[in-house]
Design a protein with these regions (language model features):
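PLP-dependent amino-acid enzyme catalytic core
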Residues: 1-243
């Protein structure tokens, strides 16, 4: 897969926002995004800069809430990771947030480099000007484990849909911020079958894998070993490309 800090992945994620907004008639829309590494929601800010009528971008986090704390207090401080049922948010350094900081600081690369050095020592304070810029771009909210489980149950009861725990975090935070007359879109970031234990804990149902994925377990495995060497890897890629 492509790691979430990879720019190609961020570019691909911009499409979500255009598709969702177009389906709602290109009117002003709010988005709530389950957020760990900040890539998905950063893609939303790019979509807005491209002219999409996104009104609010809302960061949704679990108890590992460094982003929520940064946006509300201006302090970006590394804490202790608390394991949760939404593990993609179980981080303390959000790699794509550096990109948002770069824009908030007006593209001052030296300032961002200094902040990243301070982060290695435990954290830093965001300047007032940059913090104001970030707050104009993003809102945030956090939910607990109990609230996440409760939201999975609620959505199952209300709609019949089964959410993964990350998506449930997003919906829970979205409901804290929804306003009458403004569409609210929450990004569903994973299939519930990816987190069967958490879903079963919430609703007593173990979600099955989609048929096209379940069938993969019955197929033969093929493994190609390659030396830990750039040239060897390049040669293999070129060889496979021509087959």
């Amino acid at each position: 897969g492509v790691n979430s800090i990879n720019w190609a992945r961020v570019v691909a994620q911009i499409v979500y926002y255009f598709t969702a907004t177009a389906s709602l008639g290109m009117r002003e829309t709010d988005f709530t995004v389950p957020t760990g590494n900040f890539g998905d929601i950063f893609a939303g800010s790019i979509a807005r800069a491209m002219g999409l009528p996104i009104r609010r971008l809302i960061v949704a986090t679990n108890q590992n809430d460094i982003l929520h704390r940064a946006l509300t207090t201006g302090e970006y401080r590394v804490g202790t990771v608390e394991p949760s049922i939404s593990p993609s948010m179980d981080i303390q350094v959000s790699s794509n947030f550096e990109r948002a900081l770069y824009l908030a600081y007006g593209g001052e690369a030296a300032a961002i480099s200094q902040l990243m050095d301070e982060l290695k020592a435990g954290g830093f304070t965001i300047s007032q000007g940059a913090l104001q810029t970030l707050r104009e771009q993003y809102l945030s909210g956090r939910v607990s484990e109990e609230e996440t489980v409760a939201m999975i149950r609620t959505i199952r009861a209300e709609t019949g849909e089964v959410l993964c725990p990350h998506s449930a975090v997003g919906v829970a935070v979205a409901r804290q911020h929804v306003e009458p007359g403004v569409p609210m879109v929450t990004l569903a970031t994973a299939h519930p079958a990816k987190f069967p234990d958490a879903v079963e804990q919430a609703i007593g149902l173990r979600p099955p894998l989609p048929p096209h994925m379940a069938a993969l377990f019955d197929l033969p495995e093929r493994v190609t070993r390659v030396e830990n060497d750039n040239e060897a890897l390049k040669s293999l890629i070129l060889e496979r490309r021509t087959q």
